[in-house]
Amino acid sequence: EEFSELLDGAASGDALDEKKRSYAKRTNLRDYAILALLSGTGMRVSELVGIDLDDIDWKKMKVKVIRKGGSEDLISLNEELVQILQDYIQFERKSYDDSQRALFLSSRGTDHNRLTVRSVERIVEKYGKSTVALKKISPHSLRRGFGTELYKSSHDVYLVQQALGHSDIKVTAEHYIDDSESVSERISEFSSGLLSPSSYNPKKI
């Protein structure tokens, strides 16, 4: 719900003030693609800003990133993310200098350099602050939210570790798994399953 609220705000721009909305018209597709990629893959902001156009394999629907520590990894993209990125590249990014191979570029000045980590943090904060429920949102909170939702869906901490690119599974378990309620619910469901209702007859006890 929080992810969709953030993306809806970025798509419409309605939550931004007039000045920010006017500026956002030039970067709307870029900003939306950034927010969608962060919330839809859980990648680090440093990994996102390091992506070049050539790092995207459109046929296999994967993007190459440089993980923490310098190792290369491939992150899968769903069809929606592929379409979002293609729209950004076709309708907005193509107006920039072709000599710059970075996927996400700054719209300031004439050089249109690669976006920095801090620039992306400001973009996320801008849309987060404009949405009441997400005032303190950051790229890292999007990453953590992705990891938490993936675990709730899969109940597989190893899958989450792989998706987030953690070398140590303890980091995944301690910092990205916020699932205490569902754990209790699953324990209750398991114990209930051990007691078949058809076998219970108080008269025979």
Where do the protein language model's features map onto the residues?
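Conserved catalytic core of the tyrosine transesterase superfamily
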Residues: 1-205
